[in-house]
A protein has these predicted regions:
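Hydrolase catalytic cores
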Residues: 236, 259-263, 288, 346, ...
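Residue-level detector of functionally pivotal "anchor" positions at catalytic/ligand-binding pockets or at interdomain
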Residues: 465-481, 551-577, 592
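Substrate-binding/access-modulating region of protease and related hydrolase catalytic domains
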Residues: 176, 181-183, 242-245, 258-355, ...
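C-terminal subdomain of the subtilisin-like protease fold in secreted/lumenal serine endopeptidases
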Residues: 164, 285-291, 425-480, 516
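N-terminal domain-start motif of subtilase-like serine proteases
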Residues: 82-86, 98-102, 126-189, 199, ...
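Inhibitory N-terminal propeptides of secreted protease zymogens
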Residues: 19-141
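Subtilisin-like serine protease catalytic core
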Residues: 20, 37, 113, 163, ...
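C-terminal outer-membrane/trafficking sorting elements
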Residues: 7, 17-18, 497-514, 536, ...
């Protein structure tokens, strides 16, 4: 199996008899490190540090580069070339045929292990059977026909061309029409090469606007990926294409980092190490979303093979690295795999990681692609997480740059990664797990997930509304028979806020106040005063409705006020931070009235780890759960109010 998820016919390559030349050297610690946790600017960019501050993510030892002295000692042990290092896995890959050097490296006190991982018959740093065309592609007739456009509600035309179906499936045009096309966001694409991205017309706009901000080849160790395999270019095109009326991607205004981590001519777990290094580089730059259309199950050397049992999110190098990437605040979006019709059948790694968005494939009508890998992961996680178009997906041809059809979870993955990026652009104040949770809740099978599409096909408009509602805050105080009411949430000039009121002696709501939004999707404050003297003791009920353009309307809040009330908390709400958590989870609970609260935490096996019951007084209180001694992994915190479960939150212990 090749680790690139398109339905291709690949040339076979066997090097099982070749001499091992590449090894992973794993270190025991990071002692005598020349870098310091106290000075992260030495190894993390300002943007990466801003992300840590924004989402309350601590700098820890995994952020420190591998100890320089260790790396130098390995290099100087003999005829040894250092290939790549991984600070998260605390290891380096090396190239050598020097047996004496290997023995010396194994004897170092700071070396935990040395393992042979790969051989290369060629030594030019390029794939032996490099694919210059991603092959089984189906041309699209009349590709310049512009009748298949998406008409927006505000009169503009989003000229998606042939990509219309794979965007409309998710109502992705809703985000674009409101100005969210990825601008200011960064996406890393980790793949096997980006053939001709420097010249294909698909990326004219990206090149003209300098949207490619970083490039690195972790296989050849150089900064050129234009001459390698076309698969990464195909994936990139589903996000970055900007050919109005012909082919437009899901986040055409985003900035991109292109990383070649996969050697398509071989299949060894050195590529998992490369993937970890790619994640780390993306993190250090400050990338928001990583899209990975790669996966690992079986290798050229059978002793490296995984079994389905290993697909537990905690075994493979790539899954461990993907989860660490999530703990740093990025959102990894991973292909589920194309094993649905094979003996393997199930999700591959790193799609089994527990803190990533794993993507299955459907067509533009939402029908499951038979090749899309099945879930769950071996530890019972719902996999895939969700699904997007990967059956007859529209991608760029490597020969012309024009749109063609192709198949694979490879293309479903970047497609939804781009839309997720646009959603996050609208709500940068929320973290990666909040975005992932909103996407799940906005999907077609959220109530009844299955092993083919997980939570289903996400609706970006619904996810947008979910996050808008979560950001809503309200407060009111009654003083001297007057209620001062304050509402805060994000909205813009395309939106209208309708406040309706009904008194306790009335049967219907009537219009009370209408507020037209102003430019810029930012948090805005609505205030009004209710004078209770004329109401003679009646209770006033309010309903706050948001209208978006001409086709979306939803109630964001409903509340009651009477002249006998005192100040209230904004709404009944629960928030947990930080997430991921290292030591202590802070659980903030706001209630409008005194409430009996029970908080329970269980691990991934359902074992009860924490249980507390207390009387919560009206207002906001914070409870703390010390998780320092708990094992790394996924936990679920459930909040019960008066015996009824009101919220369950998945948190990651890093």
């Amino acid at each position: 199996m090749k680790a690139i998820f398109t339905l291709l016919t690949l040339l076979s390559f066997s090097n099982t008899e070749a001499q091992q030349t590449r090894y992973i050297v794993k270190f025991k610690d990071k002692a005598t490190n020349t870098f310091s946790i106290a000075n992260p600017s030495a190894y993390l960019s300002p943007r990466a540090l801003q992300r840590r501050v924004r989402y309350n993510i601590a700098i820890d030892s995994t952020d420190l580069p591998v100890t320089t002295r260790y790396v130098d000692s390995v290099r100087l042990a003999g005829t040894v070339t250092i290939l790549n290092s991984s600070k998260w896995l605390n290891q380096v890959t090396i190239k050598t045929t020097d047996a004496v050097a290997l023995a010396k490296i194994n004897a170092f006190a700071f070396v935990k292990s040395t393992a042979a991982v790969a051989a290369r018959l060629g030594d030019n740093g390029l794939p032996i059977n490099k694919k210059l065309d991603t092959a089984i592609e189906e041309p699209i007739n009349d590709i310049t026909n512009k009748t298949n456009l998406v008409s927006s509600t505000n009169g503009d035309v989003a000229a998606y061309g042939r990509a219309s179906g794979q965007i409309k499936l998710h109502q992705g045009e809703f985000l674009h029409e409101h100005g969210f096309k990825g601008e200011g966001m960064q996406i890393s694409v980790l793949d096997g090469g980006f053939f001709r991205y420097l010249t294909l017309p698909t990326f004219d706009s990206v090149r003209a606007n300098n949207q490619i901000i970083n490039v690195w080849d972790f296989v050849a160790n150089n900064n050129s990926v234009d001459e390698d395999d076309a698969h990464g270019m195909n994936c990139l095109s589903t996000i970055a294409a900007n050919m109005p009326g012909v082919f437009v991607g899901t986040a055409p205004k985003a900035s991109f980092c292109l990383y070649r981590t996969e050697d398509v001519a071989t299949e060894t777990n050195i590529e998992e190490h490369n993937l970890a290094a790619g994640f780390e580089k993306a993190d250090s730059i400050g990338v928001d979303v990583c899209t990975v259309s790669l996966g690992y199950t079986r290798f050229d050397y059978s002793n490296q093979n995984y079994t389905y049992t290993n697909m537990d999110g905690n075994t493979s190098m790539s899954a461990i690295a993907a989860d660490i990437a999530a703990s740093k605040g990025m959102l990894p979006v991973i292909a589920c795999g194309n094993e649905g019709n094979t003996s393997w059948r199930y999700v591959s790694s790193p799609g089994d990681a527990d803190s990533v968005m794993t993507v299955g494939a459907v067509d533009t009508l939402g029908n499951v692609a038979s090749f899309s890998s099945y879930g769950p992961s071996s530890d019972g996680q719902i996999k895939p997480t969700l699904a997007a178009t990967g059956l007859r997906a529209v991608i760029a041809s490597p020969s012309t740059g024009l749109p063609v059809f192709s198949n694979g979870t490879s293309f479903a993955t970047p497609n939804i990664a781009g839309l997720t990026t646009c959603l996050w652009q609208a709500y940068p104040e929320v973290n990666n797990m909040s975005i992932l949770d909103a996407m799940q809740k906005a999907s077609s099978r959220f109530i009844a997930p299955n092993d083919r599409v997980g939570y289903g096909v996400p609706d970006m408009k619904k996810a947008f509304v979910i996050l808008m509602s979560r950001g809503y805050k309200q407060n009111f105080c009654v003083d001297k028979n007057k209620a001062n009411v304050q509402l805060k949430f994000k909205f813009d000039h395309t939106m209208t806020v309708l406040i309706e009121r009904k008194l306790s002696n009335q049967n219907i709501f009537t219009n009370y106040k209408t507020i037209n939004g102003t430019a810029g999707f930012t948090e805005k404050t609505i205030t009004f005063i209710e004078n209770f003297l004329p109401l003679q003791g009646l209770t006033a009920s309010y309903k706050v409705t948001v209208r978006i353009a001409n086709d979306t309307s939803f109630v964001i809040s409903a509340f009651d006020i009477n002249q006998y009330q005192t100040c209230t908390p904004p709404v009944d709400e629960v928030s947990i931070n930080p997430n991921p958590v290292l030591d202590v989870a802070n659980i903030s609970i706001s209630r409008k009235q005194n409430t009996n609260i029970n908080i329970q935490m269980v691990n991934a096996l359902g074992q009860l780890m924490h249980n507390i019951t207390y009387q919560h007084k009206a207002g906001t209180q914070v409870q703390f759960i010390n998780m320092k001694s708990m094992s790394k992994g996924v936990y679920f915190v459930s909040i019960f109010a008066e015996g009824k479960k009101i919220k369950t939150v998945k948190i990651l212990k890093g």
